[in-house]
Amino acid sequence: MRILFLLFSLTFYLPGYSQRSETVYRTKGDSIQNYYKVLIPDTVSKGLLVIIGGFCGTPIDVMQETKLPETAVKAGYTVVIPYLVDDCSTIDSKNLYQTRLESVIPEVIKSYNIPKDKFIIGGQSLGGHRAMFYTEQAYKANNEKIIKPNAVFGVDPPLNMKRLWDTFTYLLRINFSEISIEESREQLRRFRIMYGGSPSQFPKNYEVASSYYPDAKDGGNAKYLKSVPVRLYCDPDINWIIENRRGSYATMNATDLSGCISQLKLLGNKNAEFVTCLGKGFKPDGTRHPHYFSMLDPEEFILWANKLLEIK
């Protein structure tokens, strides 16, 4: 059944400046998931920036962690922050997120009169992986309904689901950090449901689900980004990982991110960047943590985006 667009929306003005913000709920009676926040510039839109939060990350969470949305809308971009699947209470074993995202993009472009050829997508953690995967499918599929981004970015996203399984297995085994133990136990449970079991049992399922898979030819799905500008941000604070998680470089997302960029460069991508943000990751309360959106510099990002999209 086709999901009706703009079944219900709330509109208000953002405090401090004149841009409007709308929250659009796509399923009648459901305000928990399948919705998105739109930040609307007070000028003609220069382009679309889609920002996806991490695991269970709502639009409000995203706006608390980074000033990128408000910086982008002030610069003239229409900003969309989706929350299409409630990760906290559901397991997206059918990749419903991808299907919903594919339908959201053209609807937003049409509804908010956004230029079709000025589109960047990205996100933090799981959101970065989802942005990468969406972009890969857009360039892989011969389907005009999947709007192709001009560029994609990720802020410390896990890209290789096999490596992530190995990391969770290791953290559970060493039994060091309570936070790591709880997260690892829950994520391994989810992986068993989503992929059928372990990578050794179902290697193809892990390859298909990964946005970068070093065991596959040309990096698996990553090969579809060989002509797409890609930015992967990372705060590779190995000492923090050692002291707080008893991990290593092998347990860090930096392993996937650096490998993916190297693979893209091998494929001839001259616009693939590994952006090092050592020491710049912090929680909204100021606590040091190298896995937060705060590592991205919003002002520098907009300069990059404007240059890439030829926006003055």
Feature-to-residue mapping (PLM):
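Catalytic active-site module of serine/aspartate enzymes centered on a nucleophile-bearing elbow/loop
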Residues: 287-312
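Alpha/beta-hydrolase active-site loop
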Residues: 92-113, 133
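Short substrate-entry loop that stabilizes the transition state in hydrolases
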Residues: 44-46, 51-90, 242
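Bacterial Sec-dependent N-terminal signal peptides
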Residues: 1-20
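Serine-hydrolase catalytic core
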Residues: 193-273
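Primarily recognizes the serine-hydrolase "nucleophile elbow" in alpha/beta-hydrolase
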Residues: 110-111, 116-175
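The alpha/beta-hydrolase serine catalytic core
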Residues: 166-214
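N-terminal cap/lid segment of alpha/beta-hydrolase-fold proteins
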Residues: 18-43
